[in-house]
């Protein structure tokens, strides 16, 4: 990768021009907020949240003692820009001056990602190589800020038609006076007129104090640091940390993390452990104290701030249970308690006791069995019985998961014995957290993944890193815990992140040696995490000065649900639209937050605050974050059961969700109905609906015949929620309808569709991606799938044509095992078939589930065997269906024949079955379906409609 991008890093051209005549630098300079990810092919925008081309000025808002960042973008419009450097003026204000040395700049280095988790595929885009500008390499401003002779110190190059975004940071010192400061940053080059961009910084009368900050406890992994900066074996840490060059690299790593507001720690170094002849524990602390002591006491950062928390050097590695007959043995208990007592005594002697926590990485899974949970309880009791009186930390789930659909979860109540709960964000429940905090327990936020928490993954939207501290504020956490902050892959700067099991959220810094730096360099995510920490300080200031409601309104508008609050039907189903990712909205929120903080804490604002502008900003913010929505959950048909009636009843189940601050009332009704159709259960009253609440209603209309569908089996019916002054919202309900055609001669089950009769109303096509967008607005799958159905009176025949785009393929292992993640399959090219012959099923247990892979190897089951389970699973009843699969150049086809006797007694079968087809195409990660399921395919309410001949099923 480095070879590919070096030409735009090095100064290989002659500069702005030859000769002595001054030239104009052929570039446009503009700016965006720090959370905006600039595409290299993106040309200059006329306006952003901090920049307007009209006067060409960058306008920023800051507090005192804050670091503010933005993207300075250089767009080479007509010709290449080369040989330019940055110059900056002092920041001059009416109340004083801030030196130009407060302005720093970084050149992003791209990190390539080729594999993506399901949350990304659902919400951000499909699988393809993407380069993310994440490693930030310091570059000179006014000739200082990078090592001379390094790649980073070379002049900048921007190719014609491209843009280069530099990350620029302005450090507002603690002694700065509030007020408006002006400066400029210029592009300069040989024989060129400097290209000057004015900057205005409004420093508000708000002081950011670390005393109201949120501690971010960050684990430092030594191996990657040692391997990147020295030739020492990273496995031999004892030798490595004794070497000056290694120590220097580690110190710089600690210092960089501390500089960005984190509290780093290391749990990989232990005292030397032995036993005397009587079996007593002997600990040699000399090496441990020499290495860890300065970091615990604050020697690893410029402010001399000691570590917020430091794990007592005890755990599953030392003393190792296997050396003392295992975790359940009395011998291990005695050694462990003796070890703990001596470790505590040493920490007390050194003055480190108030920072110490006890943590065992056991069990290592989030779903432990009963014996593992009892072992944890016993372990905690041993710790407490040792009399060390130190907080015990656990990552376990502190509440039963049965209410959330995880009926198989083994829960043991450890509330009374665990002191610090650091449960992964996905399982943090608001009511449980509140109760733990009421009991005096400490809770830490352990980020994992969206939508339950912002993600620190390289590929995550940039706002996610910033949102983590906001979530900690909302949930009342004492700290944020990042167990891995430096665990970068060995060739992270050279090779793509491509393996499915390869993390991309385990490091916040990068090895800087490649760029000529003698220590690590920050990531863009670290900068945004720091921005969120500074936001947290403003939120705390608002709360402590009687404006908690204002702080809460801002935070709850950006993060509307987190933890279990983001669950849908169960713990594996998620509401993906409960977070705001728009970077401009986050920039607006940050500006409002600092203005509100100044109004709350200052008697002398930096300059008069316009209440009219403040109100306009609030209205703009709330309009961007709060909405009134209508979601369609089900669109089903059934034969009209009323005496003397024929035709079909069409029922739409819909949810109205109000995020508006004012109470909402209105009526939900059908839009225009097709000719001949009539509403029979319509015009439903909803409300008063309070802020962030949901109301569910059903609308029913009668159709004399089944609705006339398009060629792919879809009929669109609009519904409308009229809330008067609050607005009118329209939604599209998609009735997915296919008729089972009758055939006298059934098709051969040979994997070929050649002998199928021409498709008419028995076609199922136009598969759409299962994402969080509304039904008809969902994107068409590039790899389309078409289904056909027919019957000969004894069997249901299904034909499937699964198309694949030209390009790379994945290796499909011939196996009838399917892996699921977030209620969708992963890894294989396959089609799922979901059937509800009763038409009234309510849960996954009730459905018939078939999985056909492109390799064959089908699965036939009753229920869906996802893990962890969301319901019961049973073998397929009755005869095993016949099947055949054929692969070709443009995809694959499959045929399946299922005996109707498998689907229960004839009298229990409905004339309209619930039915859906779903397709996973693994090359791009497309997961699509026919029936337009809202979030996942295993809820029978989301199925489409399979209509049998009027004579009945199996006639």
Positions of predicted regions on the chain:
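Structural preference for beta-rich elements and adjacent junctions enriched in aromatics
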Residues: 706-955
């Amino acid at each position: 990768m480095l070879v590919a991008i070096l030409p735009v890093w090095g100064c290989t051209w002659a500069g702005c021009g030859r000769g002595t005549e001054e030239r104009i630098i052929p570039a446009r300079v503009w700016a965006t907020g720090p959370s905006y990810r600039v595409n290299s092919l993106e040309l200059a925008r006329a306006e952003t949240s901090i920049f307007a081309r009209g006067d060409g000025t960058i306008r920023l808002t800051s507090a005192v003692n804050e670091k503010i960042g933005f993207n300075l973008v250089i767009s080479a419009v007509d010709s290449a820009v080369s040989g330019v450097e940055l110059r900056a003026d002092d920041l001059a204000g009416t109340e004083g001056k801030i030196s130009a040395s407060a302005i720093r700049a970084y050149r992003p280095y791209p990190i390539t990602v080729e594999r993506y988790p399901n949350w990304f595929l659902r919400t951000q885009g499909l699988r393809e190589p993407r380069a993310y500008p994440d490693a930030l390499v310091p570059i000179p401003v006014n000739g200082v800020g990078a090592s001379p002779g390094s790649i980073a110190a070379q002049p900048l190059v921007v190719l014609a038609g491209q843009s280069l975004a530099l990350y620029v940071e302005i450090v507002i010192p603690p002694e700065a006076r509030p007020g408006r400061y002006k400066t400029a940053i210029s592009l300069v080059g040989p024989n060129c007129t400097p290209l000057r961009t004015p900057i205005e910084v409004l420093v508000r009368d708000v002081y950011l104090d670390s005393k109201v900050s949120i501690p971010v406890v960050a684990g430092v992994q030594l191996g990657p640091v040692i391997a990147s900066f020295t030739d020492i074996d990273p496995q031999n840490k004892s030798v490595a940390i004794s070497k000056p060059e290694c120590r220097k690299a580690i110190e710089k790593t600690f210092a960089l993390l501390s500089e960005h507001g984190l509290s780093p720690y290391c749990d990989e170094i232990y005292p030397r452990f032995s036993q005397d002849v009587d079996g007593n524990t002997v600990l040699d602390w000399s090496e441990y104290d020499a290495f860890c002591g300065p970091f615990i006491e604050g020697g690893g950062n410029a402010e001399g701030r000691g570590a917020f928390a430091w794990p007592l050097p005890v755990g599953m590695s030392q003393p190792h249970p296997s050396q003392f007959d295992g975790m359940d043995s009395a011998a291990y208990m005695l050694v462990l308690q003796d070890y703990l007592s001596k470790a505590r005594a040493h920490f007390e002697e050194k003055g480190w006791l108030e920072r110490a926590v006890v943590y065992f990485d056991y069990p290592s899974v989030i779903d432990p069995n009963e014996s593992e949970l009892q072992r944890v309880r016993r372990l905690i009791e041993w710790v407490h019985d040792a009399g060390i009186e130190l907080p015990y930390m656990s990552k376990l789930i502190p509440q039963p998961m049965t209410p959330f659909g995880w009926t198989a979860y083994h829960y043991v109540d450890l509330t009374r014995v665990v002191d610090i709960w650091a449960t992964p964000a996905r399982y943090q429940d608001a009511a449980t957290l509140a109760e733990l905090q009421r009991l005096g327990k400490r809770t830490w936020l352990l980020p994992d993944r969206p939508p339950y928490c912002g993600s620190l993954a390289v590929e995550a939207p940039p706002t996610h890193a910033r949102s983590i501290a906001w979530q900690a504020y909302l949930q009342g956490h004492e700290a944020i815990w990042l167990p891995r902050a430096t665990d970068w892959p060995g060739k992270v700067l050279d090779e793509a992140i491509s393996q499915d099991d390869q993390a991309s959220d385990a490091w916040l810094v990068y090895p800087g040696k490649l760029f000529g730096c003698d220590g690590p360099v920050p990531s863009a995510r670290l900068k945004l995490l720091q921005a969120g920490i500074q936001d947290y300080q403003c939120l705390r200031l608002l709360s402590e000065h009687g404006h908690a409601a204002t702080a809460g309104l801002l935070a709850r508008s950006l993060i509307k649900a987190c933890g279990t609050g983001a669950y849908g039907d169960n713990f594996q189903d998620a509401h993906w639209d409960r977070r705001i990712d728009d970077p401009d909205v986050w920039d607006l929120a940050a500006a409002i937050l600092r203005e509100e903080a100044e109004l709350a804490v200052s008697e002398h604002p930096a300059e008069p605050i316009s209440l009219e502008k403040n109100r306009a900003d609030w209205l703009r913010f709330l309009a961007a974050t709060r909405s009134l929505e209508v979601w369609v959950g089900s669109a089903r048909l059934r034969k009209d059961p009323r005496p003397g009636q024929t035709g079909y009843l069409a029922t739409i189940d819909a949810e109205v969700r109000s995020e508006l601050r004012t109470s909402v009332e209105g009526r939900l009704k059908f839009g225009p109905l097709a000719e001949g159709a009539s509403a029979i259960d319509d015009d439903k009253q909803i409300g008063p609906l309070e802020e962030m609440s949901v109301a569910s209603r059903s609308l029913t209309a009668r159709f004399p015949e089944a609705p006339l569908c398009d060629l792919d089996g879809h009929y669109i019916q609009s519904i409308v929620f009229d809330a008067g002054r609050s607005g009118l919202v329209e939604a599209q309900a998609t009735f997915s309808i296919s008729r089972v055609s009758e055939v006298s001669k059934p098709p051969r089950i040979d994997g070929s569709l050649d002998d199928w009769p021409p498709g008419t109303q028995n076609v199922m096509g136009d598969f759409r991606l299962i994402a969080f967008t509304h039904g008809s607005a969902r994107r068409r799958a590039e790899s389309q799938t078409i289904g056909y159905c027919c019957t000969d009176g004894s069997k249901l025949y299904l034909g499937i044509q699964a198309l694949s785009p030209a390009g790379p393929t994945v290796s499909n292992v011939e196996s009838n095992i399917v892996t699921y993640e977030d209620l969708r399959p992963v890894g294989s090219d396959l089609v799922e078939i979901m059937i509800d012959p009763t038409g009234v099923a309510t849960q996954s247990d009730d459905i018939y589930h078939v999985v056909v892979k492109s390799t064959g190897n089908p699965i036939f089951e009753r229920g869906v065997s996802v893990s962890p389970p969301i319901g019961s699973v049973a073998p397929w009843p009755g005869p095993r269906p016949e099947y055949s699969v054929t692969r070709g150049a443009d995809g694959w086809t499959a045929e399946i024949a299922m005996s109707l006797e498998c689907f229960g007694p004839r009298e229990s079968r409905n004339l309209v079955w619930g039915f859906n087809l779903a397709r996973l195409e693994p090359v791009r990660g497309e997961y699509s379906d026919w029936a337009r399921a809202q979030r996942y395919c295993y809820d029978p309410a989301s199925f489409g409609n399979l209509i049998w001949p009027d004579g009945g099923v199996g006639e």
